[in-house]
Amino acid sequence: MIQDILHRYLFDNADVRGELVQLQDSYQQVIGSHAYPPVLQILLGELLAATSLLTATLKFSGDISVQLQGNGPVSLAVINGSNQQQLRGIARWDGELADDASLADLFGQGYMVITLTPDEGERYQGVVALDKPTLAACVEDYFNQSEQLPTALWLFADGKQAAGMFLQVLPSQEDHNADFEHLCQLTATIKAEELFTLEAQEVLHRLYHQEDVRLFDPIEVCFKCTCSRERSAAAIKTIDQAEVEAILAEDGKVEMGCEYCNAKYVFDGIDIAAIYANGTASNTQQ
């Protein structure tokens, strides 16, 4: 079974870098907590793979968010992650979605927002329109606008597994566009089934057996939600106390749910009193 792994590699004779990611468990954890329509399962798989590939390009410790928004039946699809390849995501939609719906069908007049938040330093945000036929092409458009380095992506998902590949010219005084185009032609021959079933080394050998490829140590990718009882308590404290106490009087408890992982945090009267007294709550219920 292919594990959730990202591989980075370099073409020593071309000043081009590459990445390959294969996802299963993390993908299932993202889509398993909601009854997503098939087309949305596939979109989230592609978005998860794209975010993992983007995360591997970060040169800092911090977080990344890749968010799709629009005025169509899908109002939001987002994957959040960290430089440690810890990812989570959700989507919101209304009504039935056709299995063959395009990005335009799903989002209408949509756009993609990529937010980079370093642990230290200023946040960066880039926005591009969802006006290309594929998510991969939209991400390429982001790189063309933000980094102005030739970049190409290939994204695949089938509701069970997700995978992706990434190529980018490294900053250099020399022109390596011809090498990049050649490597893109080789990479474009990849099939989803190969990425879903073959080990990364076998995939790279099949694609680039005549190239000088340097493969780096693999990086584990995982689903990780950042919700907690403490964060839920902090969210409750932002609500007017009278409103919370009204809920408590009617239901006997206040329940907070996480959209990402479906965790439930339950607070009783003693907890609520403690939250408004000093911002803490007991850890006895979840």
UniProtKB/Swiss-Prot annotation:
GO MF, one example: protein folding chaperone
Any one GO BP annotation for this protein: protein refolding
Instruction: Tell me if Zinc is a UniProt keyword of this record.
Output: yes
Chain segments annotated as transmembrane: none
Question: What InterPro entries does this protein map onto?
Answer: Heat_shock_Hsp33, Heat_shock_Hsp33_C, Heat_shock_Hsp33_N, Hsp33_helix_hairpin_bin_dom_sf
The entry's cellular-component GO terms read: cytoplasm
Summarize what the UniProt record says about post-translational modification.
Under oxidizing conditions two disulfide bonds are formed involving the reactive cysteines. Under reducing conditions zinc is bound to the reactive cysteines and the protein is inactive.
Signal peptide, first to last residue: none
UniProt entry keywords in alphabetical sequence: Chaperone, Cytoplasm, Disulfide bond, Redox-active center, Zinc
Q: Which family does it belong to?
A: Belongs to the HSP33 family.
| Functional description taken from the UniProt entry | Redox regulated molecular chaperone. Protects both thermally unfolding and oxidatively damaged proteins from irreversible aggregation. Plays an important role in the bacterial defense system toward oxidative stress.
Q: What is this protein called?
A: 33 kDa chaperonin
The source organism is Shewanella sp. (strain MR-4)
- What taxonomic ancestry is recorded? Bacteria, Pseudomonadati, Pseudomonadota, Gammaproteobacteria, Alteromonadales
